[in-house]
């Protein structure tokens, strides 16, 4: 496997200093002088982001912030929260007009409070024109009406992670391509004492990704194109019945998993398949004691369900600035700075495939071809459906995701708390309150 010099930089303990001192700072100073966004006098920014899963991604990110500060004089203070803690903290900040200047969260977060997001249409237009245009999912997540309320910084591909040896033991040479094949594979791995598992707790990334995929794969939907709730359908029942069978062949305990649990149990050798980003593989490669796992795992696309087409749901990471910030120009400058090629290419390599680009110009970044096990993640931003499904991505769809309406519906059936019809009724009632 080829290791690229820039990746070596960001994985070292001196990553921040190395990147900032290797030409990045001089470029950043020139950029700051030419950029249309001039930070306000005395500007300082606070940013709340999700807790990283790949150390070298965060190293590269902090290196870029360091260069931005030295070039503009704007200090950026970063705090980190788990996926599930960001929506409530951002909502409180929006309601009280107090908190971090910027939030870097998940999926449709800005659409929980679109009127509290700084209009960043100028930044989005600048980046889109310069870097080959935005992928469709980024436009959907970025815009509210005719204006951009956030910058979709990246997408984390949520793919199937699996152990190659367990796949072969189950009698297969490639990962299942259909939901029927996937169920048989789950049964076989359980029989072989190499079960898999997918989160069914309030895991903002992993749990939502697989239950939305499952619902859509069977033709079910939360709402129609007019945002009318249509959850109560035979297709939803089929999706729940299928999920129950999958669950019965998973490792026990997934109903309490958050976004970190499957990483831990996969790396501990307790499961042989799960849905996740590239962070499990990245951690295994980084840890000399997990080399055997890194060599014995790979990634696959989600199986296609009865509707006959992909229904993947990957994790978008939008960045927004709150309207209460005293420094909107500094906030815009930071967003634009991060996605400039001289910065973003290094960051992508530092993320070792965990982050996927939403701008077409970055298709040729070497991270996608340096390791064949990374390549599948390159298309995540282009393949993903968006949180609204058939409907719009707005406050209602964002609230349904944040409230785990579909996750709880699936969990109620899988754990036996409710039968499918009763679980659908509960979820339908919750969704109707949001969409009225």
Language-model region placement:
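N-terminal export signals
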Residues: 2, 8-31
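Conserved C-terminal helix/tail region of periplasmic/extracytoplasmic solute-binding proteins
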Residues: 37-39, 75-76, 168, 383-436
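C-terminal lobe and pocket-closing loops
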Residues: 37-39, 108-111, 125, 279-294, ...
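Short, well-ordered beta-strand elements
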Residues: 41-53, 76-79, 102
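Extracytoplasmic "Venus flytrap"/periplasmic binding protein-like
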Residues: 63-134, 165-177, 265, 269-273, ...
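Extracytoplasmic/periplasmic solute-binding protein
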Residues: 145-153, 158, 183-229, 235, ...
């Amino acid at each position: 496997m080829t290791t690229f010099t820039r990746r070596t930089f960001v994985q070292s303990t001196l990553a921040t200093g190395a990147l900032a001192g290797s030409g990045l700072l001089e470029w950043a100073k020139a950029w700051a002088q030419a950029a249309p966004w001039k930070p306000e006098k005395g500007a300082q920014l606070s940013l709340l982001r999700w807790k990283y899963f790949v150390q070298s991604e965060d190293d590269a990110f902090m290196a870029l912030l360091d260069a931005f500060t030295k070039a503009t004089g704007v200090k950026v203070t970063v705090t980190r929260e788990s996926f599930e803690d960001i929506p409530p903290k951002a909502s409180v900040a929006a309601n009280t007009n107090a908190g971090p200047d910027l939030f870097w969260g998940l999926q449709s977060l800005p659409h929980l409070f679109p009127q509290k997001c700084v209009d960043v249409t100028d930044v989005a237009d600048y980046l889109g024109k310069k870097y080959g245009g935005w992928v469709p999912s980024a436009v959907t997540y970025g815009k509210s009406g005719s204006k951009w309320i956030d910058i979709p910084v990246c997408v984390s591909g949520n793919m199937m992670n699996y152990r190659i040896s367990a796949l072969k033991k189950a009698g297969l040479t490639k990962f299942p391509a259909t939901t029927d094949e996937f169920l048989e594979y789950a049964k076989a791995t359980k029989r072989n004492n190499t079960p898999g598992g997918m989160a069914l707790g309030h895991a903002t990334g992993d749990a939502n990704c697989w239950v939305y995929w499952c619902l859509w794969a069977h033709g079910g939907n939360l709402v129609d194109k007019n945002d009318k709730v249509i959850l109560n359908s035979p297709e939803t029942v089929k999706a729940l019945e299928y999920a129950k069978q999958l669950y019965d062949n998973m490792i026990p305990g997934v109903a309490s998993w958050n976004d970190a649990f499957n990483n831990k149990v996969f790396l501990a050798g307790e499961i042989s398949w799960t849905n996740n980003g590239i962070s499990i593989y990245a951690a295994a490669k980084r840890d000399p004691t997990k080399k055997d796992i890194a060599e014995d795992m790979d990634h696959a696309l989600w199986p296609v369900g009865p509707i006959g087409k992909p229904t993947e749901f990957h994790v978008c990471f939008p960045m927004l600035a709150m309207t209460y910030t005293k420094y909107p120009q500094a906030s815009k400058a930071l967003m634009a700075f991060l996605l400039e090629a001289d910065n973003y290419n290094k960051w992508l390599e530092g993320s070792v495939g965990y982050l996927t680009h939403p701008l077409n110009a970055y298709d040729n970044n070497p991270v996608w071809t340096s390791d064949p096990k990374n390549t599948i993640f390159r298309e995540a931003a282009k393949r993903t459906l968006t949180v609204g499904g058939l409907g719009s991505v707005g406050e209602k769809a964002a609230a349904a995701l944040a409230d785990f309406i579909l996750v709880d519906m699936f969990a109620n059936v899988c754990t036996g708390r409710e039968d499918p019809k009763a679980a659908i009724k509960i979820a339908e009632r919750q969704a109707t309150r949001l969409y009225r």
